[in-house]
């Protein structure tokens, strides 16, 4: 799934998640979209574990979906488990993960899409 496709797929999840998405790009090469697609996008380029953990923590009280994408194969599950908030955030439908490659949808126990994972 290409980056733009992943972003648009996540944007489509905005209503079920009940939250807003914000554009946030950590790389110098921000994607250029012809339409305004508000989404939280963390580019794998230059993204390390520390900033990802900080981003995961930042949504705890903000009720804002957070995207965490890694270039080394890690996923948001590892990140959120590290800060002890996986169940809380996933239960609140507050996590969406966007990536440029190796992107797949994440389903909960009921088979409902609850996020997008980028990783190997």
Please describe what each predicted stretch is.
Residues 1-38:
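Class I SAM-dependent methyltransferase SAM-binding "motif I" and its flanking Rossmann-like core
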Residues 33-120:
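A contiguous loop/helix-start segment that scaffolds small-molecule binding in enzyme catalytic cores
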């Amino acid at each position: 799934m290409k980056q733009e496709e992943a972003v648009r797929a996540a944007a489509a999840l905005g209503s079920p998640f009940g939250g807003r998405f914000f554009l946030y790009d950590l790389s110098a090469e921000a994607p250029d979209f012809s339409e305004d697609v508000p989404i939280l996008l963390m580019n794998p380029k230059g993204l390390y574990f520390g900033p990802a953990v900080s981003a995961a923590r930042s949504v705890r009280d903000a009720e804002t979906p957070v995207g965490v994408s890694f270039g080394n194969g890690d996923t948001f599950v590892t990140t959120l488990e590290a800060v002890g908030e996986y169940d809380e955030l996933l239960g609140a439908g507050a996590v969406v993960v966007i990536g440029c490659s190796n992107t797949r949808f994440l389903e909960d126990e009921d088979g409902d899409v609850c996020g997008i994972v980028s990783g190997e």
